[in-house]
Every structure is written in structure tokens, then in C-alpha cells.
């Protein structure tokens, strides 16, 4: 039986404008075929095909502002900031996996223990022949537990902005589970098409673990949840869906300040390196003459925001040229790097309702440190 790899680069202004369907099959070495679908502009490289053997990789690359423009805008503002997505290149994604193993980072341990207890209940909630979509995916034990608990899952769709990390994690899941794996290379914060799979799909479920929802401010978190709700309400192409879709999302609960801050200021400095890596990327990829040694990292609880805010603090006044401007970094000012919002269960239910989602079920650990919510569209 021949292997089929789907590789598509779809460029669009909006999904409704995509009117052209291009199908092109190209015979490659070792009996492997490539199918280019839903493409205005298609690009192939031999080295890409080698690592994708046996997987279907779907690439959705919407027209976006140049990254340099985004960085420039963040650094000329009254409060300097950088896009949080800059953390997640291949090295950044690997560093985040290391963070999840740290002693101080309680979130992963507590969530994993909770998932061991509730995975069967989640599997029952999403039902048979469900397509599981995981934005910002990783080859984690949490995902393994859920896939193992799901009755006859139809497919697994990991979505990630880091292409190399996506392929590695997708291959790991494919090795461990007898399920069709359809990796999607995309920015999961932007709406994108859901791939079709070979099996009949009765429903879709989005799995968003690890308190990643907390990395968005309240407005952006609501927008993201609305996007998820739209994705699970859409009918699969075969029209077989008979169950309402679900959004299964984890969030970190509010707790003692010192404990929350320690989770983001680890003694080994992995979280600091996670942030310094962004400075290195700007220097290497955008030729912005920033030096990591001119900054120090610190994460603090900001009560009025209900969030841990991670910042790089300027150690010495210095200036750099960027996009025709000279940007000055004053000693003592900070670059806002990332935020990690915490919620009480009631606060999160209110956020879900504002996103047109209803809370169907909520699970927490015994101490109430971490929660997993099962949501469904309010209209379902």
C-alpha cells in the first residue's frame, strides 16, 4: 500500500476567498506520493519530504504582517513588549518542555495526575469517532492518556506554529497510537480549515491543556475560545457528525502568590533562558542588535491583571536601530514578554459564557490548584 503525504501551502486573505482547488500528484522516490491540495502557491523541498514520510502535513500560511513590523510596534510603545509567539521556535518549544519538568512548575505534575483520574470521563464526554484537535500541541503524556481513553477516535490533529517541533511530536504520537495523525502547521490563534480524515467523524473536540489559555489577556482569550467554538460547530465534510463538539481546556487556579511566582522564576534558570532565546532570535533572524546580557529576567504576580507577568528588565541604557528608528532602552525599564492569567472556577465559567460556550463539566484536583473544563457551544 503506497504512502500518501499531503503538503499544501495555502495563502489567503480570508477563507471565503479561496476559490481555486489545485490537485497535483507527483511521484517521488521509494513509492511515496505527494498530493498538493487547496493551494494557490505550493512549495516543495526534498528535505521537508524526508522528515514527513508517513505523515500528512497541512500548511496554512495566512498573509501576516512582517515580523519585524510587529516587533518594532511593540518596542516603540509606551510600555515595551514583544509578541509571545516569538518564544516558540524549535529551541523555545524544547525549552518549554523542559520547564514543564521543573520542580517549581507544579502545573504539569498536578494536571497530569488529574488527567489520570478524569481521562475516561473526558473520553466519554467527547464520544465515539471524535476527531481530537490539539492547538499548540506536544507529544505529551496528557495527550496519550486522552487518546487512550477515547472510544474509537477518528483522528488526531496537532496544530503548531513551530514546524519542526510539530513534525517531531506528530511522529511520536503516530508511533504510539493506532490512529490517523494529521499535523497542521499554522498559527492556532488564527482560524484555519480543519483537515478531513479517512474515518467517519461523529464530532470534533479541541484539547487545549497546560493552562495555555492563561497566556492570553481576557479579551484575546475570549476571542480564541470563540474561534475554537466555531471549529467544533462546523460539520465535517462527510456530514456524519451527530454529537455536539467539545472544547476541553485546562487552566491554573489562583493561589498563594509566592507559589505562583516561584513556578516562573525557577532556580535552574530555564524560564529565563526561554525568554532570553527571544532576544537571540531577534538578533539572528531579524538582525536587530540586541544583546541578552543587557537584560535580566523576572516574573511577578500583578493583582489587578490576575496574572503572572514575565519581563526582561534593562540593566544599562542602550540604543539599537530598527526599521529606520533608533530605539532606546532605559536602565530600569522592562520589556513585557508574556503573561499567565489565573482564574477561579467562577471567573473561567464567565469567560466561557462570554465566548458563547457553556460549561458542561469542571474537574479540579483535591487542593483546587488546577482545573480542566469541558465546554460546548451555547447553542448546542
What are these regions (language model features)?
Residues 31-85:
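N-terminal auxiliary segments of SAM/dcSAM-dependent transferases
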Residues 235-252:
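Conserved beta-strand signature within the Rossmann-like core of class I S-adenosyl-L-methionine
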Residues 154-190:
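Class I SAM-dependent methyltransferase SAM/SAH-binding core
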Residues 261-341, 353-354:
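Substrate-binding/catalytic lobe of Class I Rossmann-like enzymes that use SAM or dcSAM, i.e.
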Residues 83-84, 96-121:
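Class I SAM-dependent methyltransferase Rossmann-like catalytic core
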Residues 216-227:
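A short, conserved alpha-helix within the catalytic core of class I
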Residues 321-380:
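C-terminal lobe and adjacent flexible extensions of AdoMet/dcAdoMet transferase-like proteins
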Residues 139-151:
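Conserved SAM-binding loop of SAM-dependent methyltransferases across substrates and taxa
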Amino acid at each position: 500500500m503506497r504512502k500518501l503525504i499531503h503538503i499544501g501551502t495555502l495563502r489567503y486573505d480570508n477563507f471565503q476567498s479561496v476559490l481555486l482547488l489545485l490537485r497535483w500528484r507527483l511521484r517521488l522516490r521509494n513509492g511515496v506520493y505527494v498530493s498538493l491540495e487547496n493551494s494557490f502557491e505550493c512549495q516543495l523541498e526534498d528535505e521537508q519530504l524526508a522528515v514527513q514520510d508517513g505523515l500528512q502535513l497541512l500548511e496554512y500560511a495566512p498573509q501576516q504582517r512582517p515580523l519585524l513590523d510587529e516587533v518594532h510596534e511593540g518596542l516603540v510603545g509606551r510600555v515595551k513588549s514583544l509578541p509571545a509567539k516569538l518564544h516558540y521556535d524549535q529551541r523555545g518549544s524544547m525549552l518549554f518542555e523542559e520547564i514543564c519538568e521543573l520542580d517549581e512548575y507544579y502545573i504539569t505534575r498536578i494536571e497530569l495526575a488529574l488527567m489520570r483520574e478524569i481521562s475516561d470521563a473526558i473520553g466519554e464526554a467527547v464520544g465515539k469517532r471524535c476527531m481530537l484537535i490539539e492547538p499548540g500541541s506536544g507529544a505529551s503524556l496528557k495527550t496519550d492518556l486522552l487518546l487512550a481513553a477515547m472510544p474509537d477516535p477518528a483522528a488526531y490533529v496537532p496544530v503548531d506554529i513551530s514546524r519542526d517541533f510539530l513534525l517531531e511530536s506528530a511522529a511520536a504520537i503516530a508511533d504510539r497510537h493506532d490512529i490517523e495523525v494529521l499535523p497542521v502547521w499554522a498559527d492556532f490563534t488564527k482560524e484555519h480549515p480543519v483537515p478531513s480524515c479517512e474515518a467517519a467523524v461523529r464530532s470534533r473536540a479541541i484539547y487545549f491543556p497546560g493552562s495555555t489559555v492563561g497566556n492570553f489577556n481576557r479579551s484575546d482569550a475570549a476571542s480564541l475560545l470563540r474561534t475554537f467554538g466555531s471549529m467544533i460547530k462546523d460539520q465535517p465534510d462527510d456530514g456524519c457528525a451527530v454529537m455536539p463538539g467539545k472544547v476541553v481546556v485546562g487552566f491554573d487556579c489562583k493561589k498563594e502568590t509566592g507559589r505562583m511566582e516561584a513556578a516562573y522564576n525557577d532556580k535552574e534558570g530555564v524560564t529565563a533562558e526561554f525568554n532570553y532565546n527571544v532576544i537571540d532570535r531577534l538578533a539572528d533572524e531579524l538582525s536587530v542588535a540586541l544583546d541578552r546580557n543587557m537584560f535580566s529576567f523576572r516574573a511577578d504576580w500583578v493583582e489587578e491583571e490576575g496574572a503572572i507577568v514575565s519581563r526582561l528588565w534593562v540593566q544599562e541604557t542602550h540604543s539599537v536601530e530598527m526599521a529606520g528608528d533608533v530605539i532606546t532602552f532605559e536602565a530600569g525599564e522592562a520589556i513585557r514578554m508574556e503573561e499567565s492569567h489565573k482564574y477561579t472556577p467562577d471567573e473561567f465559567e464567565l469567560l466561557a459564557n462570554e465566548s458563547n460556550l457553556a460549561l458542561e463539566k469542571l474537574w479540579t484536583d483535591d487542593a483546587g490548584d488546577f482545573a480542566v473544563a469541558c465546554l460546548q457551544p451555547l447553542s448546542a
